[in-house]
Regions:
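Acidic/polar, glycine-anchored loop/turn motif associated with catalytic or activation segments
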Residues: 159
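Short, positively charged patches
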Residues: 4-152, 156
């Protein structure tokens, strides 16, 4: 067990599916597509990344010591994230991960493509021009209003 301040006991994270582990990794502060991809490359599966011991994570050489600490602390949010994951369907939101059959092909050529998308509604066909509003899950009230305004204007314009 790590004795550094702020790092709590390491729980037994071994019952998650690959998809659940990936969803949780997408929520770790500072983890983007590149970091998650490098970790998966080193460990083989998202489950192995999620359940890795601190020494294994450090040895992988992907994360700085500070980011290892952030990751270990973030794993304590697992149950909240899983509750959110299983609540998405009720709100009409789909979690689409790279590799899923409905992940947009138009993103595949890009190196910095999103690892996952949260989609409400239907995605357009790959040949159809489209606009997406991308933002933070914890945006300000102004951010919500601005996104809503632009989404409405674009929809009214037939985009």
């Amino acid at each position: 067990m790590n004795e550094r301040k702020g790092v709590h006991k390491i729980m037994a994270y071994n019952t998650l599916t690959e998809r659940e582990a990936f969803y949780c990794l997408c929520h770790v502060p500072g983890f983007g597509s590149a970091t998650i991809g490098k970790l998966r490359e080193r460990f083989g599966t998202y489950q192995e990344v999620w359940t890795a011991k601190e020494q294994e994570i450090q040895k992988a050489g992907v994360l700085t010591e500070k980011r290892v600490t952030v990751f270990l602390q973030a794993r304590e949010q697992e149950s909240a994230w899983l509750k959110e994951f299983y609540g998405l369907e009720r709100t009409g939101i789909r979690f689409i991960a790279e590799g899923d059959t409905d992940y947009p092909e138009r993103f595949l050529p890009y190196k910095d493509r999103p690892a996952a998308l949260f989609v409400k509604g239907n995605l357009p066909e790959n040949e159809v021009p489209a606009v997406a509003i991308v933002g933070a899950r914890a945006c300000t009230e102004y951010g919500k209003e601005a996104a809503g305004f632009y989404a409405g204007e674009l929809a009214n314009a037939g985009v």
